[in-house]
Amino acid sequence: MSKNTEKAIPVWEKYSLNVPEAAEYYGIGEKRLRQIANENEGADFILKVGSHIRFKRKMFEDYLNETNTI
């Protein structure tokens, strides 16, 4: 399938989000998301694909629900 005919998966159905997607979805800046990833290296909600950071959506939501300050 070409990109024009592919059906886009809604963000709320994706397993993981890249930094720009997560920033838009959660309303948190990209810089802060990268800091969170660096501060929580090895956390269950972080997925590293090569040098790229992805956030496991449901697990990151659980993390946010338990956090008082970002």
PLM feature spans:
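Polyanion-binding surface elements
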Residues: 5-32
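Short, Lys/Arg-enriched charge-dense amphipathic segments
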Residues: 12-14, 67-70
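Residue-level recognition of hydrophobic positions within alpha-helical transmembrane segments
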Residues: 17, 57-58
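Major-groove DNA-recognition helix of helix-turn-helix-type DNA-binding domains
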Residues: 24-54, 61, 67-68
